[in-house]
Amino acid sequence: MSTSFTMIGGEGPNSYREHSKYQGALVIAAKEKINEAISTKLDIDFTSNLVNIADFGCSSGPNTFTAVQTLIDAVENKYKKESNIEGIEFQVFFNDSSNNDFNTLFKTLPPARLYFASGVPGSFFGRVLPKNSLHVGVSSYSLHFVSKVPKEIKDRDSLVWNKDIHCSGSSKEVVKLYLGQYKIDVGSFLTARAQELVSGGLLLLLGSCRPTGVQMFETVEGMMIDFIGSSLNEIANQGLIDQQKLDTFKLPIYAPNVDELKQIIEDNKCFTIEAFEKISHAKGEYPLDPEYLTSAFKVTVGGSVASLFGQDGMEKTYELVKEKTQEMLPQIAKAKPGMQYLIVLRRN
């Protein structure tokens, strides 16, 4: 991944581990549909007692443990119904970028787990496992990243220089460039997974996208990132961070709408879409709590802010973000909801 983007690691109060319950709740909400998909759509040769499972974009836990255990339980149930093989063993590959906090991940592995665990550092936009070695893959809240921000967007002298720190949707030219990069990257992700999966293997994607017609700046996520951008501008104006650095600081994030995401998968032709389900999130939309919202976006974006502007710059930024969130709660309450999804893909 040319643009590294990792969550804040560790087990402290500002870590992703402590502020990822919202993401983890989607796996729980989708559990019944995941079980159904594994039971009816997984079509692999049950002649071996070894099943390989991988989580692409695992972060530092604990959600990845919930996701892989859900898959293991579902596959085990299918084995019991369709095979006489006993003593099934599971190998789980935890993949994320090399900057991910694998130490925390492995330190907090469930002690009673009944699987072998391996860490696989590397960009999931390319192949990270041998060909035809994987039976079931999962990726949760990871397919909104791009491998790099289009260079024109970061160039202050470019006609399409983006004044925002992300693709807010306010400029059609910026959206076009981000979407172009997103198509390339998701296509690469899918092609790599298709090479790794055995014939009839499944890839399950969970995450959030925009309903058709909804722009990023109309969503809670878009509003919060806009608050981060405006807060950075304020402290740059105070001379606390470098303005030139800020002008080129763009997040490698693109939130697709549902039609864009479906079209990219269909155009890739490596998979059959077995299910494209809207999931009712157990926690609904984000809570209207400034402390919660600020912390949630600090653990996801704060690491990138700190890497460029220092820890002090990051802390000052998020003090302002919290103030803006409190002030703008009435507008946040009117934000348009996103769509939480489960996509089940079978390798062709």
From Swiss-Prot:
Cofactor: Mg(2+)
Uppermost EC category: transferase
Residues noted as binding substrate in the record, renumbered to the chain: 16, 19-23, 141-145
pH dependence: Optimum pH is 8-8.5.
Tissue and organ expression note: Mostly expressed in leaves and, at very low levels, in roots, stems, flowers and siliques.
Residues annotated for S-adenosyl-L-methionine binding in this entry: 16, 57-58, 63, 94-97, 123-125, 140-142
A GO BP entry: response to jasmonic acid
EC number(s) reported in the record: 2.1.1.325
InterPro entries assigned: MeTrfase_7, MeTrfase_capping, SAM-dependent_MTases_sf
Reaction equations catalysed: (2E,6E)-farnesoate + S-adenosyl-L-methionine = methyl (2E,6E)-farnesoate + S-adenosyl-L-homocysteine; juvenile hormone III carboxylate + S-adenosyl-L-methionine = juvenile hormone III + S-adenosyl-L-homocysteine
Binding site for Mg(2+): 162, 247, 249
Activity regulation annotation text: Activated by Mn(2+) ions. Strongly inhibited by Cu(2+), Zn(2+), Fe(3+) and Fe(2+) ions. Moderately inhibited by Na(+) and Ca(2+) ions. Rapidly degraded at temperatures above 40 degrees Celsius.
Free-text remark on how the cofactor is bound: Binds 1 Mg(2+) ion per subunit.
Expression induction or repression: Induced in the presence of the herbivory P.xylostella larvae. Accumulates slighty in response to wounding and to several defense responses-inducing compounds including salicylic acid (SA), jasmonic acid (MeJA) and alamethicin (Ala), an antibiotic peptide of fungal origin.
Keywords for this protein: Magnesium, Metal-binding, Methyltransferase, S-adenosyl-L-methionine, Transferase
Annotated pathway: Sesquiterpene biosynthesis
Pfam family, any one: Methyltransf_7
Entry's Gene Ontology molecular function annotations: farnesoic acid O-methyltransferase activity; metal ion binding
Subunit structure and binding partners: Homodimer.
Family: Belongs to the methyltransferase superfamily. SABATH family.
Function as written in the Swiss-Prot or TrEMBL entry: May catalyze the production of the insect juvenile hormone methyl farnesoate (MeFA) to trigger defense against insect herbivory.
The protein, known as: Farnesoic acid carboxyl-O-methyltransferase
Organism per entry: Arabidopsis thaliana (Mouse-ear cress)
